[in-house]
């Protein structure tokens, strides 16, 4: 039997409700929940002595249960004569102080300020089926009538699904009238006779009528889920309504995840109740291929502090791999946020236990213990060393984190894209001990002083290149003539884009004959590299604070510069383009021609290309080919990055085998006794799949 409206128009029609109640007969239809779900809130705001006006009562048992609980001065109205007759017959003897009247809620016959409380459960929703002018006028009449009959200090309790247009009308009307507005979320949904649930949560809005005071801010509050929690106050109706919509979105996610496995990763943020800043990010990953047993339905994985940018945790593909490897049907991967304090794993588990159960998969056995997993024995470490703001990239942080194997790293992260590490360096901590020298002159000998330990000095491991594309760019130097002699040759290198300086420093330190010039547009980046990444300039290392486009065009116009190597490692600030490295202007033909003009005839132009748009990538390659006749490409494993090695002539073509052999010879020269080398870095390996394009 279909008891729910077939369309929103039926939802508001009196004829529908007449038919509806005839079909229901004596049984109560508890629209949006019954007394058990609502009683806690109702008795919080409605006192036994209050005179209560119930709008659109229907044949709900709510008024009867309120009466039996002590709130006996109840006046109920409804537009349906059928339901009012039924309710009067049912209650006239048992509940003599409660009245039921046929009346239109938009034009009642009650005196002004005669009620201390007004209760509406779904009537406003039923009226506001759309945003037509007539509908909005009817809603305004209803709310104005409620305001008229309610005494100052009285409360209007509105139980609603808070659809967007209803929410807008309700909040705007009462906040603009100077009323205090508070909202509670009651439940996930109301269970129907078939066992299905509403996909949207139910809210109780509590509007308190107060005397308007000029200049007094409107009070807009959302109550937390847990008992005893402090209300969250919002500064504007827009913020308040967005908070309600966030609850609705979360409820829809819960509903979907509780009933089905998700074929796609679902992510959401949990915010701190006081600061409203993100405290946790959840990534919910289902692995349908996992064979279910009693104990592998559900688990939580905590990413150690500071490691959320690693591929395994920071990419969807990596998280999918992680979920498959741990062997649970559903895995919630939890990222911790900077600027939030976490005590230990036990405290995190206690904080999240209730929330993660809301996102449990279907079929989770009752009382099953949910395991909390991690990549280490503790929650990791993150120390913010410096904060700043760049004119070009916005706010940024420099932070030290402990990675896998207790290695420590320093990272530059722009907060506009927190999942991407702009620069990273491996740290080498050292300490210096200052002891007292022994004196032969006993008369002058002072009392012994304990050895003093200076504060730990942080040193950068300049052999470490964190980015795989940086390693590939260095490997591309094997394309130069006589790579075995290259480290000592006076090669001239132009690098566009500084970052933390690791790429430029590597060239400077491992190619002692080189002369490196770096062009960086952002002074803040140079400051960070110099102050926090041990970058320094000397006679072989010079930084130009300039726009790379302008600088290269100027060099080409002057016709004096000639470089053996030109490297582009510069990102785009325009997210609307399907290419994040480099900016489109850097691959225009006229500009590339200037790059060609300042490149040695036997030199190499190395471009870090990050392009997700296949058509745009093809276009870039076509333009490059118009300027550079020979181009090698090396894809970076598990990344979008592609390194292009562009030669100004095609007289000498290397096979993949020849290039790898050339890279091996170059690496032999770079691995000098007494010079630190990253054992994980193989130049030849970085060119394993290079090909001419």
Curated annotation (Swiss-Prot):
Keywords per UniProt: Methyltransferase, Multifunctional enzyme, Transferase
Catalytic activity: L-lysyl-[protein] + S-adenosyl-L-methionine = N(6)-methyl-L-lysyl-[protein] + S-adenosyl-L-homocysteine + H(+); N(6)-methyl-L-lysyl-[protein] + S-adenosyl-L-methionine = N(6),N(6)-dimethyl-L-lysyl-[protein] + S-adenosyl-L-homocysteine + H(+); N-terminal glycyl-L-lysyl-L-glutamyl-[protein] + 3 S-adenosyl-L-methionine = N-terminal N,N,N-trimethyl-glycyl-L-lysyl-L-glutamyl-[protein] + 3 S-adenosyl-L-homocysteine + 3 H(+)
GO biological process per UniProt: methylation
InterPro entries referenced in this protein's UniProt entry, alphabetically: Lys/N-term_MeTrsfase_sf, Methyltranfer_dom, SAM-dependent_MTases_sf
Pfam families: Methyltransf_31, Spermine_synth
SUPFAM superfamilies: S-adenosyl-L-methionine-dependent methyltransferases
Enzyme Commission identifier(s): 2.1.1.-
UniProt-recorded Gene Ontology molecular function terms: protein-lysine N-methyltransferase activity
Known function: Dual methyltransferase that catalyzes methylation of elongation factor 1-alpha (eef1a1 and eef1a2) at two different positions, and is therefore involved in the regulation of mRNA translation. Via its C-terminus, methylates the N-terminus of eef1a1 and eef1a2. Via its N-terminus dimethylates lysine residues of eef1a1 and eef1a2.
Family: Belongs to the methyltransferase superfamily.
Alphabetical list of NCBIfam families matching this protein: MFS_SpdSyn
Annotated protein name in UniProt: eEF1A lysine and N-terminal methyltransferase
Organism, scientific name: Xenopus laevis (African clawed frog)
């Amino acid at each position: 039997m279909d008891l729910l409206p077939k369309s929103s128009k039926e939802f508001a029609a009196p004829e529908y409700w007449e038919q509806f109640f005839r079909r229901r007969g004596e049984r109560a239809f508890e629209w949006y929940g019954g007394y058990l779900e609502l009683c806690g809130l109702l008795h919080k705001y409605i006192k036994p002595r209050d005179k209560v006006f119930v709008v659109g009562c229907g044949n709900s048992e709510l008024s009867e249960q309120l009466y039996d609980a002590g709130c006996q001065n109840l006046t109920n109205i409804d537009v349906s004569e059928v339901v009012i007759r039924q309710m009067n017959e049912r209650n006239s003897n048992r509940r003599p102080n409660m009245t039921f009247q046929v009346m239109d809620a938009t034009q009642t016959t009650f005196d002004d300020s005669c009620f201390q409380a007004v209760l509406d459960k779904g009537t406003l929703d039923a009226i506001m089926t759309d945003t037509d002018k007539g509908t909005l006028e009817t809603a305004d009449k209803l709310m104005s009538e409620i305001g008229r009959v309610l005494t100052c200090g009285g409360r209007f309790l509105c139980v609603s699904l808070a659809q967007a247009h209803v929410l807008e009308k309700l909040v705007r009307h009462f906040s603009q009238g100077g009323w205090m507005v508070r909202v509670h979320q009651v439940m996930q949904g109301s269970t129907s006779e078939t066992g299905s649930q509403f996909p949207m949560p139910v809210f109780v809005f509590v509007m308190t009528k107060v005397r308007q005071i000029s200049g007094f801010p409107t009070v807009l509050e959302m109550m937390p889920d847990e008992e005893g929690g402090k209300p969250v106050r919002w500064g504007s109706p827009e913020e308040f309504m967005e908070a309600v919509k966030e609850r609705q979105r979360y409820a829809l996610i819960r509903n979907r995840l509780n009933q089905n496995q998700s074929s796609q990763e679902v992510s959401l943020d949990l915010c701190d109740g006081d600061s409203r800043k993100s405290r946790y990010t959840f990534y919910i990953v289902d692995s349908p291929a996992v064979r279910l047993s009693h104990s592998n339905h559900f688990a939580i994985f905590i990413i150690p502090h500071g490691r959320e940018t690693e591929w395994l945790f920071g990419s969807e593909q990596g998280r999918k791999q992680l979920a498959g490897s741990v062997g649970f049907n559903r895995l919630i991967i939890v990222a911790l946020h900077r600027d939030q304090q976490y005590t230990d794993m036990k405290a995190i588990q206690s904080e999240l236990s209730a929330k993660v159960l809301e996102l449990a998969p279907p079929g989770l056995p009752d009382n099953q213990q949910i395991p909390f997993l991690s990549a280490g024995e503790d929650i990791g470490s993150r120390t913010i060393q410096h904060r700043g703001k760049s004119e070009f990239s916005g706010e940024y942080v420099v932070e030290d984190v402990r990675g896998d194997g207790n290695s420590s790293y320093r990272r530059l992260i722009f907060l506009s894209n927190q999942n991407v590490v702009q620069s990273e360096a491996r740290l080498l901590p050292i300490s210096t001990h200052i002891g007292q020298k022994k004196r032969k002159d006993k008369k002058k000998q002072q009392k012994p002083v304990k050895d003093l330990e200076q504060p730990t000095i942080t040193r950068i491991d300049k052999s470490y290149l964190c980015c795989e594309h940086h390693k590939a760019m260095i490997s591309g130097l094997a394309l130069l003539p006589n790579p075995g002699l290259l480290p000592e040759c006076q090669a001239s290198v132009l690098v566009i884009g500084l970052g933390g300086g690791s790429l430029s420093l590597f060239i400077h330190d491992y190619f002692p004959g080189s002369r490196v010039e770096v062009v960086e547009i952002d002074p803040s980046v140079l400051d960070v590299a110099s102050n926090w990444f041990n970058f320094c300039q000397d006679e072989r290392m010079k930084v130009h604070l300039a726009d790379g486009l302008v600088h290269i065009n100027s060099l080409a116009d002057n016709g004096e510069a000639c470089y053996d190597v030109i490297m582009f490692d510069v990102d785009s600030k325009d997210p609307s383009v399907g290419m994040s490295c480099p900016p489109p202007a850097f691959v225009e033909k006229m500009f590339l021609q200037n790059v060609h003009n300042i490149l040695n005839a036997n030199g190499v132009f190395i471009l870090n290309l990050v392009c997700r748009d296949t058509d745009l990538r093809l276009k870039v390659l076509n333009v490059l080919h118009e300027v550079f006749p020979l181009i090698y490409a090396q894809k970076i494993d598990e990344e979008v990055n592609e390194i292009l090695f562009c030669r100004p002539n095609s007289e000498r073509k290397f096979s993949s085998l020849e290039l790898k052999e050339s890279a091996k010879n170059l690496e032999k020269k770079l691995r000098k006794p007494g010079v630190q080398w990253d054992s994980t870095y193989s130049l030849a390996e970085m060119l394993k799949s290079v090909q001419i394009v």
